[in-house]
Amino acid sequence: MEDPVQLKEEGNKYFQSNEYGQAIQCYSKALKLITDKKMQAVLYRNRSACYLKQDNYVQAAADASKAIDVDASDIKALFRRCQALEKLGKLDQAYKDVQRCATLEPKNRTFLETLHRLGTNIQEKLHVQFSTDSRVHKMFEILLDKNSEKEKREKAANNLIVLGREDAGAEQIFQNNGVNLLMQLIESKDPEMILSAIRTLSGMCTGHRARATAIVHLVGINKICSIMAVDNEEIALAACNLLQNIVDSLTGEDKKAHGKQEALVLDTKKDLKIITTHLLDMLVSKKVSGHGRDQALNLLNKNIPRYDLKNKDNSKSLFVVDAGLKKILKVLGQVPELPNCLPLTPNTRLNASVLVNKLYDDLRCDPERDNFRIICEEYITGSFDPKDMEKNLHAIQTVSGILQGPFDLGNKLLSLQGVMEMMVALTGSENEVDQLVAVEALIHASTKLSRASFIITNGVSLLKDIYKKTKNEKIKIRALVGLCKLGSAGGTDYALRQFAEGSTDKLAKQCRKWLCNPSLDIQTRKWAVEGLAYLTLDADVKDEFVEDEQSLKAMFELSKTSDKTILYSVATTLVNCTNSYDVKEVIPEMVQLAKFSKQHVPEQHPKDKKDFVEKRVKRLLKADVISALSCMVKADNSILTDQTKEQLSRVFLALCEDPKDRGIIVAQGGGKAMIPLALEGTDVGKIKASHGLAKIAAVSNPDIAFPGERVYEVVRPLVSLLNTERDGIQNFEALLALTNLSGKNDKLRQKIIKEKALPEIENYMFENHEQIRQAATECMCNLALNKEVKERFMAEGNDRLKLIILLCGEEDEVKLQRAAAGTLAMLTGAEKKLCHKMTEVTTQWMEILQRLCLSEDLQVQHRGVVIAYNLINADKELAKKLVESEMLEILTVIGKQADVPNKQHIINAAREALVKCLDYGFIKTVS
């Protein structure tokens, strides 16, 4: 059995060596073994000191209290409890403890200083508290007095919002019956007062779980949702923000440290489930405004699916699928033109599609996905009714909405009996609403070639008739987009054109005509861009489009409007125009094999060849495409999806292809715009944007391309391109870019090292590809100026220096030899230790050095002579080795040459080396 006294001594030793965790373990073990009260008090006091050091103030105060219970005059325990209580904000209790300490030891300066400090702090706190109390009362008096001046009420309302955001102010409002008074403001029916009350409640709920829980129960979820349901965008948004803050506080997502009182809060899962249920009920309630429905969808989108798929708990999504998927589908199926439609905004159905997509992506296994599909199938088939056309429209509109979300699921639903047939049948209807719904559904359904072929066979003539005959612009533009999408169903395959030669050109002209017509509403012009997004897969169309500068500028202007849902269509059009989509590599042998087996072989359009693409890129740059792209990158994250970011990254990379164009891109802010694309989005998008940054950073002045602190943000994307899974060209251009950056300053070199680029750069110095090996060595040459890199070369047990010396001997690759010799010159000039190490790591060092000094390339020769000087300057023994070899003769020949401008720096370096030898007394001047 262990001895408690020995355990105490061990604990003391651990405490003195700052190993507080080990000390706590020893004291805790000793406490279990001992019954003597005085000894227990000492152990509690010691453990309290450990907890103080670990910033665990609650436990420190508890242990000190246990020691004081045994001996009320234990001065150490009293002071430790005082320190802990002060940190916990309990100043009055801390003051009492230090007052007792000062009574016991009146001359102790530490106690007296603490007593004075705490006294001052308590006075300040009381002053703030009383002033806050009076301010809160005064504000509520003004707000609740209907006779108060409007200006006074607005000022009081704003002050209340500010107070609600401060912890002390929020607590004072809460303690002074503030929640009930705020509810009176909400009941006043004055929009300004309602907004102020909601925003104040929102501030009070932020970062405080106990207060948030109390407010939920005092106000009620039902009441908050009814406020969010009103037809006022600002109030709906404020109520949404209030609910979001409540959810964040209940789940701990606010990332704030919670105090001791948080332990009293009961399990919050029940409250969160009630909130989710109320939000789902809001989706199908006719009493809820379009803005309220949008905010309910936004809250579900943000809080239900998992952010991190590594977290295996998707129970929230499963609950919503079971309890509310049909309600979400009801929103998807709404037709705004019908009289009994729920109140909607232009974005409501799109938000619902996003939610369906996120829920479907959040499912973890096939049974969960099957359940999701079955619910959708039952809902759609249950909506079909031969006697009720409105129900049929609702079913088709639902399928259309799902096709805009989880497309794979939507495609399975298209296979249901009667769905495609119903779409085609509704297209032939004389009712404009039927046509509108059916045409839009056909557009979304014709993404897969097999579906497009069915529509071309059964419905294209109907679409043409609608396009020619209808006078309704909304239907006409949708019919046009439908024809555009069907016409592009063959993709870039020239042999799979769906329509006759010239048909797609006519469709494109009409799209451009609508796009350039400012009298048309944004929604119609948006559809025109969507049509072009499909048609520009045809090389003839994209060639004509980029020549039409008016259409390009109209599209760019449209992308800057408040309706950001157009961004994906614009980005896709630009991807098509620059040919920056993925193209499978054509292997000639496989083509021959396919022809032999009578399989279809894709054909490239003549205008998709490299020279045509380059001309299109030049025209886009001339039309100010970079400014438009920069504006698109700044769009709100909820609209700028990862897929859109990927498309923008592809376009930027294609625009950066020609080094001559990179100056224009930098001048128009393209370098800055690419940074966020390289840091966020899909893996493919980040790689493409990083590659674009590498192309810019490789040839541009970093101060101009990435001004200020932005240059440091570029390093991580560039380092990511050094991954061995990336292409050789990406590795090469990333190394060039890092070389350029590392030559700028040591802070940048330090950032490159911090991002763990050194091992990757060293790895590429062994690469078989000579250009990559050269780029890596050049990068190392610049990094060699950094202290940490020098230390890595000086460290024992590695061959870094040996590799550099051997690369200096690569006479067949002059650029590589220059880079390696430059690195060696830097290292030997900076550290004398490396001069000695150079002669030890390989026996070939002398031969390689002599070859450097005799090189025909002046840059290599200069580096060789500098290395020789560094060795001579470093140590007399090293100098002796060089003098005893043929090096002396080589340096003498170089030093005796007549002054020549292009070789003067080499001659001077050789002369300096000879002067040093003269100083050592190894050689004498000829009298």
From Swiss-Prot:
GO terms for cellular component: A band; cytosol; perinuclear region of cytoplasm; Z disc. Changing C779R: In dicky ticker (dit) mutant; impairs sarcomere formation. Causes paralysis and loss of heartbeat. Acts as a co-chaperone for HSP90 and is required for proper folding of the myosin motor domain. Plays a role in sarcomere formation during muscle cell development. Is necessary for normal early lens development. It is found in: Cytoplasm, Myofibril, Sarcomere, Z line; Cytoplasm, Myofibril, Sarcomere, A band; Cytoplasm, Perinuclear region; Cytoplasm, Cytosol. This is Protein unc-45 homolog B. InterPro entries: ARM-like, ARM-type_fold, Armadillo, TPR-like_helical_dom_sf, TPR_rpt, UCS_central_dom. ARM repeats lie at residues 167-206, 209-248, 746-785. TPR repeats lie at residues 4-37, 41-74, 76-108. GO terms for biological process: cell differentiation; lens development in camera-type eye; muscle organ development. SMART domains: ARM, TPR.
